[in-house]
Amino acid sequence: MAAKEVRFHTEAREKMLRGVDILANAVKVTLGPKGRNVVLDKSFGAPRITKDGVTVAKEIELEDKFENMGAQMVREVASKTSDIAGDGTTTATVLAQAIVKEGAKAVASGMNPMDLKRGVDKAVDAVVEELRRNARKVTKNDEIAQVGTISANGDTEIGRFLAEAMEKVGNEGVITVEEAKTAVTELEVVEGMQFDRGYLSPYFVTNPDKMRVELEEPYVLIHEKKLSNLQALLPVLESVVQSGKPLLIIAEDVEGEALATLVVNKLRGGLKVAAVKAPGFGDRRKAMLEDIAILTGGTAISEDLGIKLENVTLDMLGRAKKVVVEKENTTIVDGAGSKTEIEGRVAQIKAQIEETTSDYDREKLQERLAKLAGGVAVIRVGGSTEVEVKERKDRVDDAMHATRAAVEEGVLPGGGVALLRAVKALDRVQTENPDQRHGIEIVRRAIEAPVRQIAENAGAEGSIIVGKLREKTEFGYGWNAQTNEFGDLFEQGVIDPVKVVRTALQDAASVAGLLITTEAMVAEKPKKEAPVPPMPPGGMDF
């Protein structure tokens, strides 16, 4: 086991504080509409330019082990806020730095760290309660656009695209962000359920111009296994032919005589049919087939259920208003499933999202949820260079999470003003001793930090701005850093989601509380590099 270094008391806190400052100072320059960019060196390719706090935080690794511990703890604040709210990472970092700085001073002056932490926790609870009480619900489309614009650093085009996407796919719908092949940013909305499997044979195509299959009001046969035996498939094909409707077959695979017969029937005009492979793999495939069955009001034919293909009747097949099958995608529009069953399935998937610990599983579950609940919107981000596209994509991601959060819990005045106004809630907090009271004062000072930083990044004097804001008592009155004007921030469209502000404060206080109460630090001793042996003298034998 390698030897360890141990640091105690003030020395430990000083080292940790230095690490916190290095990381926070690099992150906080990005805060606000006039925040600056940070350039990140990449071991390959062009450097990356970003204004996203969590991206900057994740790049920082310090040489000194003890300083690095402090930096990594604050990086955890940014990551946690990003995971929960998707935005507000820079605000969380600024708040954490402010609480840690004030807390370390108090501990150095002889106060009890545990009481300070209790005071900080009480203060945060009171402020969060005040924020929730003053929240406004977001209902109008232009309010959603404003939230997106603010989070995308004043880019109105991004705000508009996000509002349009949310209007079309609903709050549960999936909005994905991709890099465009052109310089133009565009929005594409896929209504209904789409999965990434295309037709098994080009002979199924009904629209040769667009090379796709279009089936109006088809039956949908959902089968879990491979279909190769024609005899098992004949009874259901005959029933569909008699009904005069088209048929979509979704199965693990369709091959051999079964595929040949379907193609021949289609070409002779006897039956309008298309076959596609089932989406996903393993257990996920089973779940997705069940989703399609619920959406179309059919039954997923599976041996687990004891249903044989030859016994399938028309009422076991799903129905849809329209199905479009392209080379690589299948879209089912307006499935005939019952609303209550779809809602039940949505609730079930939501519960699984809450329980899962895997990010990959969560992402896949959210995709399934969106396909059932609304649809999928794709924002393709364009730009002149690869560096510009990546920077813009970061901002679109932030803005997308912020708009979702705004719809969920409502909005507050932006620019750090909501936290400043929530200070009055601290006067009502009861404490048991002077050290807890000091913990509350730490939070009182710390929640000014975002306003000060936004002002300083915009070239103004932070303390003057804070002083002017304190003169007025209206909750929405604040300073717009973009226009350098004072006024009602709700009217000016400078708004932040409650969830983002709340999460930033709670996560910052949580990690800062741990740092304040740290009394010892243990790290591995740096290994001394062995000196390189000298080169032997060159030979003289020539």
Swiss-Prot record:
Subunit details: Forms a cylinder of 14 subunits composed of two heptameric rings stacked back-to-back. Interacts with the co-chaperonin GroES.
Compartments where found: Cytoplasm
GO cellular component, one term: cytoplasm
Lineage, top ranks: Bacteria, Pseudomonadati, Pseudomonadota, Alphaproteobacteria, Hyphomicrobiales
Main localization category: cytoplasm
GO molecular-function terms, A-Z: ATP binding; ATP-dependent protein folding chaperone; isomerase activity; unfolded protein binding
Binding site for ATP: 30-33, 51, 87-91, 415, 496
PROSITE patterns hit by this protein: CHAPERONINS_CPN60
Protein name, as recorded: Chaperonin GroEL 2
EC number: 5.6.1.7
BP GO terms, sorted: protein refolding
Group of enzyme by EC: isomerase
Keywords: ATP-binding, Chaperone, Cytoplasm, Isomerase, Nucleotide-binding, Plasmid
Record flagged with keyword Metal-binding: no
Pfam family of the protein (one): Cpn60_TCP1
Catalytic activity of the protein: ATP + H2O + a folded polypeptide = ADP + phosphate + an unfolded polypeptide
Annotated family: Belongs to the chaperonin (HSP60) family.
Function description: Together with its co-chaperonin GroES, plays an essential role in assisting protein folding. The GroEL-GroES system forms a nano-cage that allows encapsulation of the non-native substrate proteins and provides a physical environment optimized to promote and accelerate protein folding.
Keyword flag Cytoplasm: yes
